[in-house]
Structure formats: C-alpha cells, structure tokens
Design a protein with these regions (language model features):
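Short, well-ordered helical secondary-structure segments
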Residues: 27-30, 41, 46, 79, ...
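Conserved beta-strand/loop positions that form the S-adenosyl-L-methionine
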Residues: 72-74
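Residue-level signal for pocket-adjacent positions within structured domains
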Residues: 34-35, 78, 188
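Conserved SAM-binding loop of SAM-dependent methyltransferases across substrates and taxa
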Residues: 76-89
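Class I SAM-dependent transferase core
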Residues: 1-70, 86, 100-117
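S-adenosylmethionine
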Residues: 90-216
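Flexible, active-site-adjacent loop/turn segments at secondary-structure boundaries
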Residues: 13, 37-38, 46-47, 76, ...
Length: 216
C-alpha cells in the first residue's frame, strides 16, 4: 500500500469525501500496474498523492456542477480519473492516443466501477466534432501555444480550458496570447488552487472561450 501522510490524508478526505476509498484504489493501480506498464515512473510512487493525485484533484473546484469534461492526453488518468472520482456529477471523456494507456485506463475504470467515464483512443485534433465539452483539461501535454489548438476546438460554443501548469504559466500565456484570441479565447488567467489543502498548491491556466462559430 502506498503511504499517505497525515496532511495528505486530510486533503484527500476534503476533496474525495466518501469516495476516498476509490481514490486509494486508484493510487494502488498507479503504484503497481501503472509503474509496471510505464505510465508512472517508479521514483514517483512515494509522492503519488502529493505530486500527482492531489495536485490534479484540487482543480475540481474550478469546474461547474454537471459539466462535460474532456481530458486531453489523459495518460494515467491525471487529471481525468481524479476528477471522475472526486466529482461523480461530472461526465468525463478521456482522450488518449496510445493503445497501452487506453487499455490500462479502461481496466482501472472497470475495476473502480466509474460510470461517468468514456475513453476515446484518438488524438485530440481528431476528436474535434466528436466531442463538445463544457471544460477541457490537460496536464503535462505541451506548451500553451500548441495546447490551445488541441483543447479549445473541443469546446462547445462556449466553455473553459483548465490546464495544469508550472511556474512558467505567465510566460506561456504571453507567448500564446494571439493563438488563444484567434481560437475564441476572451479571457486568460493564472489561478492558484488548493492553497489551504496542499503544501505546494496547483497552478492552473484558465481560458474562458466564447466562439462565434464552431472551429473545425
């Protein structure tokens, strides 16, 4: 079993509530089959809770009730599966092009009994027209100049991109400003999430989008 500190447990209880056991089972999947099959590096196991699961799960506070969320480049389910566990009111579409990752994701979804998750084996740019999300999430996919073009077209006429980023978030916004505006972004900001829960809060780039017409 993956160790969890008292502080991590407190944060996990607040985020996952009565679904904490599901979160613990997910972490065990990450630590075992996830590492065996190359979705998570072995060195990450001791910090799965703090650096990965809680880091991702706290962004649930930025997503409105009942939203359809598309998670681009879902990989090991970060943040997609974290959100599906924390927020059963959300409808999650996990978009992942690599077959071995898709197989693993489906195994975890089936084992946890998550009925609010759909997995698509495809690239984000090929999912345009098949997904009309209210919110698109991403973590460690690419720089914002490229990520904007992968995420914004997946939104319905209006919506939000919630991308987990690092300390360079502000610089990325500056470089991507023109691309974001062209795609329909009307407001872009850096938001710090989880300050009261995590030792290292999560940095999020939030893009509010209102498109005049569907971008193909």
């Amino acid at each position: 079993m993956v160790d969890i500190t008292a502080a991590e447990l407190l944060a996990a209880e607040k985020i996952f509530g009565d679904r904490l056991d599901l979160a613990k089972r997910y972490v065990e999947h990450l630590a075992t089959s996830g590492t065996e099959r190359g979705l998570i590096g072995p060195r990450e196991v001791p910090r799965l809770w703090s650096r990965h699961v809680l880091n991702c799960a706290v962004i649930e506070s930025e997503i409105a009730h009942g939203s359809h969320v598309a998670d681009v480049g879902s990989g090991a389910g970060l943040p997609g599966l974290c959100l599906a566990i924390a927020r059963p009111d959300l409808e999650l579409t996990l978009i992942e092009p690599l077959e071995r990752r898709v197989i693993w994701l489906q195994e975890v979804v089936d084992d946890l009994g998550l009925t609010n998750v759909t997995i698509m084996r495809t690239r984000a740019e090929l999912a345009v027209g098949m997904v009309d999300a209210d919110v698109v999430t991403a973590r460690a996919v690419s720089a914002l100049t490229n990520l904007a073009g992968l995420t914004i077209p997946l939104l319905a006429g209006k919506g939000e991109v919630v991308a987990i980023k690092g300390r360079s978030a502000g610089e990325e916004i500056e470089k991507a400003a023109k691309v974001i505006r062209k795609l329909g972004g009307i407001q872009t900001s850096v938001v710090t999430v989880g300050e009261s829960l995590l030792e290292e809060p999560t940095t999020v780039v939030r893009i509010v989008v209102k498109k005049s017409q569907k971008i193909a």
